[in-house]
Structure formats: structure tokens, C-alpha cells
């Protein structure tokens, strides 16, 4: 399987809310995570991020979905980029406020680096969190 195939399978597992259990097969043990987005700025591992996504999508944003706009792979850095659109409505419990019934349609990018063992070794999420939080009525 190519590195792009691994990155793509990981992306779909994470965004399909499979959490750590569904994503671990694609992820290196020490895979780091980074995001300059307030809700996830303190998340430091890829698998912890996968669990965060699962909690968000099975809790306050139950029924959320995503669409990939574009995907590419840079062989020189072993990094896949996924530009996607996340859509979710705050209808479930677990958010910072009671369910608002408001929806966000939020652009984001995953930069997923795959190592020579064909495992995700690093991930960066680029996301305008304040936009999404405002649309959801959370700020």
C-alpha cells in the first residue's frame, strides 16, 4: 500500500469517528499532533486527536459529516494534504452550552506525514476554530 493510501485510510477513519480503535493501525506509536486552534491546541498526539474527533462527532455534533475538496501527496516530504469541509449541527449533549441547533460549515486541512514503516508519524490540522465556534453559537 502506498503512503498516500495509508494517509487516505487514516483520514477517513478519523473523520468517520472511528477514534483510537479505528485509527491506531495506521498510526506510529509516537505520532505527534499539532494545531493552532483553541479547542485542540493542547492535544499532542494523533490518537488523542482521533478520540477528540470521535467524542465531538458522537456527542454535541452527532450526525456530522465531511467532504474532501482536494487531496495531494508530496513524495519529497512524505506528506499528504487533505482539504475538506466539515459540517455539523449542535444537536447532542456534551458541548460547552446546551444544544443550539446551529450548524457550522468549516474548511480545514490535514497535513499527514507517513514514515518509512507506512505509519502516520505526524499530523497538523489547520482550522479556523473561531469561525466554527461562532457558527455553532458556542462563543
Regions found by a protein language model. Give the residues of each.
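C-terminal and inter-domain tail/linker signature
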Residues: 1-139
